[in-house]
Amino acid sequence: MAGDDMTAESAEPVVELLDEAECQGLIAAGGVGRIGYTGRFGPTILPVNYVLHEGTIVFRTGQHSPLGEDLRTGIEHAESKVAFEIDETSAATREGWSVLVQGSAHLVDSEAERASIVQSGVEPWAGGEKELFVRVIPSRISGRRIRRAGPGGG
């Protein structure tokens, strides 16, 4: 019967929850992620180029960028509660994954720490002078994968 010939394109999507180790593996290579935070003008989401460094997410931004201005509170060791999202999707196959990291963002002040981060290879997304280094310390990591079920539902 024609209805029995299920292809990957017609299969129903399956959502799988990912454990923390799977999430860490997916984001370990670095790349582009999105930082979400409450800025001066309300909820804000911006793309940044990040790397994983010593179990944390690090990226660079400009001193006078919206993100840089929102994170510089004038209070030493201040932290901002943030969400950081990384994903990979395929419009063609309608499959992909996403990882959500929730935690606190801190400006990195220590020159030794900044030098260590530079060694990790983090480069700004937009290029140009990005003198602020931001570290996101995860308090919760979650993720999910969406894939097409194969014949027989699995």
Predicted regions and their residues:
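Charged, gly/pro-rich active-site loop segments
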Residues: D4-P13, V82-G154
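Short connector loops at helix/strand junctions that flank enzyme active sites
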Residues: A28-G30, I45, L52-E54, E76-K81, ...
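N-terminal short leaders/motifs
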Residues: M1-T7, G42-I45, L52-I57, I86-A92
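Short beta-strand segments
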Residues: G30-Q63
